[in-house]
């Protein structure tokens, strides 16, 4: 065990090791809440379907406007300041959920949590890219995702027990975990932002430098839209698919996390030498099959197969895309590039629940997921066609600056 600790210490930098710890702590408590948030709001707001969807849409809708500012903040003030502020805001929001009773209070707290996420995600990803050699970035992102999945494995099971006992305990534990992470980061987290980056003013001011990452954003929307639906409307759609839907959701969440924990690093390491074109082709095929799987899964076996296929897609694709963006971005715009790309999650999670709720009530859940399967195939073909231009022209141009 001591040998393993020294191996981790020598292989990964201090910011990376701290991120490992924080990811494990917060993923466990966050996973207790994730599968049940929609159901909790659904019950608290007298069985309404659209009101929970509206509240959940507010956070990512606000994030759309906040994320670009957050990327600029992390590039100007530094990664450490942005991360500490983010953790404090998220801890305060989760504490508020313990006492919230009215719809407008839930909405305010959801937006506050979104501000924290908008700051944390680009800052933490930029810090990983700055403190890790390029040859090891995909590995580090994969390990972080695997650690996150480790927390997700146990989180839903504990969350179901707490939800049946008293749901507010879930929020209290999440708030405590975020605050502990904040305290340790305040003591141990170094600043990794370059003190004197080689800034090219013309490059910074030009909108054209963002075109490649905007293209990635656009063609990643179907992926994030699939996640938006599995996190919201699928929770309600599953009521019609399974008699014991709470147990099925819990088993699905735990199984998917376990698949990710086991498969994440081997899949990333095994595909490092593949071209981005091949990686993205595999990724979008897997996501398209998973979307169709959600539409037709009527048994636990089918649902677990869907989870496994989706895990392969996200393990291969999402991790390599993070590394790809770190190569794409000029050093002085790294935080903003991660922020811009991350907008696709906010866009999907702002319009997805509302659009999905309307389709669910009008046409049924199958229509949502079959339509997403078609969109994913189309986006995947488009991205595999254009990705070679980004690899051979844009990255070469940026690296010469």
Curated annotation (Swiss-Prot):
<dbReference type="InterPro" id="IPR011701">
    <property type="entry name" value="MFS"/>
</dbReference>
<dbReference type="GO" id="GO:0022857">
    <property type="term" value="F:transmembrane transporter activity"/>
</dbReference>
<dbReference type="InterPro" id="IPR020846">
    <property type="entry name" value="MFS_dom"/>
</dbReference>
<keyword id="KW-1133">Transmembrane helix</keyword>
<comment type="similarity">
    <text>Belongs to the major facilitator superfamily.</text>
</comment>
<feature type="transmembrane region" description="Helical">
    <location>
        <begin position="207"/>
        <end position="227"/>
    </location>
</feature>
<keyword id="KW-0472">Membrane</keyword>
<feature type="transmembrane region" description="Helical">
    <location>
        <begin position="357"/>
        <end position="377"/>
    </location>
</feature>
<keyword id="KW-0812">Transmembrane</keyword>
<feature type="transmembrane region" description="Helical">
    <location>
        <begin position="20"/>
        <end position="40"/>
    </location>
</feature>
<feature type="transmembrane region" description="Helical">
    <location>
        <begin position="248"/>
        <end position="268"/>
    </location>
</feature>
<feature type="transmembrane region" description="Helical">
    <location>
        <begin position="289"/>
        <end position="309"/>
    </location>
</feature>
<feature type="transmembrane region" description="Helical">
    <location>
        <begin position="167"/>
        <end position="187"/>
    </location>
</feature>
<dbReference type="Pfam" id="PF07690">
    <property type="entry name" value="MFS_1"/>
</dbReference>
<dbReference type="InterPro" id="IPR036259">
    <property type="entry name" value="MFS_trans_sf"/>
</dbReference>
<feature type="transmembrane region" description="Helical">
    <location>
        <begin position="140"/>
        <end position="160"/>
    </location>
</feature>
<keyword id="KW-0813">Transport</keyword>
<feature type="transmembrane region" description="Helical">
    <location>
        <begin position="49"/>
        <end position="69"/>
    </location>
</feature>
<keyword id="KW-1003">Cell membrane</keyword>
<dbReference type="InterPro" id="IPR050497">
    <property type="entry name" value="MFS_MdtG_subfamily"/>
</dbReference>
<protein>
    <recommendedName>
        <fullName>Uncharacterized MFS-type transporter YhjO</fullName>
    </recommendedName>
</protein>
<feature type="transmembrane region" description="Helical">
    <location>
        <begin position="104"/>
        <end position="121"/>
    </location>
</feature>
<feature type="transmembrane region" description="Helical">
    <location>
        <begin position="83"/>
        <end position="100"/>
    </location>
</feature>
<dbReference type="GO" id="GO:0005886">
    <property type="term" value="C:plasma membrane"/>
</dbReference>
